[in-house]
Amino acid sequence: MQLETFQQIDRILDLDLDAKTIRVEAQVPEHSTIFEGHFPGFPIMPGVLLTEAMAQSSGWLLLGVMKFERMPFLAMVKEAKMRGFVSPGQLLTIEAKIEHEGSGFAVTSAKARVGTELKCSADLTFRHIPFPDPALRVHMDAMAHKIGFPLQAIMQ
């Protein structure tokens, strides 16, 4: 994770476009200025950033299903639950699944775990639109390469 640049996902482990699921890894950094205030003596990953990591995981899934033709933007968070603390240095595994898609919106369910322990979950709604600027598409293509997005999956 690179918290300062909001890159929450380090690597895509599995993308199944038929099942509409994704599994990713996100390594929580050992050191970050975020932990200086959250919380001194007991650093934990902020729930809002855990939610963002689940949203980014869902976003990569949606990009794949839509073959990088439309860009998803987070529109609503429902049923977000923080079930345990996530500490610096821990490895998150995040899974997301598309529950519904249509009329320019998509709903996903996402869960983040450390090992087998569920740490958080949420239902997320996205609005997706054609890429509003070519520079954003170029950026997303570069990020896809960086995190190991299987581009061959969208060329079938």
Identify the role of each PLM range.
Residues D10-L13, K78, R83, K97-E99:
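Conserved positions in beta-strands of structured domains
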Residues M1-L3, K67:
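Short aromatic-glycine motifs in intrinsically disordered, low-complexity regions
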